[in-house]
């Protein structure tokens, strides 16, 4: 007792950080709430537990678990988690006189109160050479996916899930591998919209504009976006 108090004169208990794994058992067991759990918003909202602290208490995002849903970005009150913007690269391309086409997600109608023509006009005023709705690509996806579903059902497959949501695809691949075989092989609306643009002008650069973080991650997987 004397030796312990000499080493730690201000407390009778000491937690060894070398041994603690932050399991929370002490917090749950203490009847006097002397051990306080400080919630971490980004950790708490992550549906796949992809965010955690390392041994130094620094938060890290595990890419092998992340499904790019964006909940952590919305939850962080300090703006510590943010997207890597490509706005500067786009503006540089426009400034160089390159043909840059804006592919706009249908969700834009719910993001702004102004008439859609005014929004498209603003994009062209910025320097985009053309604006195309991703809904055009969605029509292609719908048709191809419908045919694929018919084929899968004829083969005896019980059901088929969409290929349009990149967040769901990541969820299936990383956390529900048994569901991966049911994902449609049809490309997403973004992909087919980019194909439409490239068919008209192979040299055109395509820029996806939409609120979905996972779809912006998806754009990095396709060379034509």
Where are these regions (language model features)?
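Conserved short-loop catalytic and cofactor-binding motifs
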Residues: 1, 18, 34, 107, ...
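Single conserved hydrophobic/aromatic residue that forms the stacking wall/gate
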Residues: 1-12
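Generic structural signal for beta-strand residues in well-ordered domains
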Residues: 6, 39, 44, 52, ...
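Residue-level signal for short amphipathic helical patches enriched in basic/charged
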Residues: 8, 37, 126
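Hydrophobic alpha-helical bundles that form the membrane domains of multi-pass transporters
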Residues: 11-59, 66-78
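Short cysteine/histidine-rich metal-coordination sites, predominantly Zn2+-binding motifs
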Residues: 46, 60-65, 87-96
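Iron-sulfur-associated redox domains of electron-transfer enzymes in respiratory
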Residues: 83-225
């Amino acid at each position: 007792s004397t030796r312990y108090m000499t080493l730690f004169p201000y407390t009778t208990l000491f937690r060894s950080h070398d041994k603690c794994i932050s399991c929370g058992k002490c917090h749950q067991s203490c009847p006097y709430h002397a051990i306080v759990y400080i919630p971490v918003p980004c950790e708490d909202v992550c549906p796949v537990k992809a965010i955690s602290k390392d041994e130094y208490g620094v938060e890290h995002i595990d890419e092998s678990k992340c499904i790019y849903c964006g909940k952590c970005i919305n939850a962080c009150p300090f703006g510590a988690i943010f997207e890597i913007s490509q706005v500067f690269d786009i503006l540089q391309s426009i400034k160089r006189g390159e043909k840059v086409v804006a592919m706009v997600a249908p969700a834009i109608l719910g993001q702004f109160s102004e008439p859609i023509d005014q929004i498209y006009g603003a994009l062209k005023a910025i320097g985009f050479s053309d604006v195309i709705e991703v809904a055009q690509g969605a029509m292609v996806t719908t048709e191809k996916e419908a045919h694929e579903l018919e084929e899968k059902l004829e083969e005896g497959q019980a059901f088929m899930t969409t290929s349009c949501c990149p967040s769901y695809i990541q969820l299936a691949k990383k956390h529900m591998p048994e569901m991966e075989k049911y994902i449609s092989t049809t490309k997403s609306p973004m992909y087919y919209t980019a194909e439409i643009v490239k068919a008209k002008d192979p040299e055109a650069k395509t820029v996806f504009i939409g609120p979905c973080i996972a779809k912006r991650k998806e754009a990095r997987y396709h060379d034509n976006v």
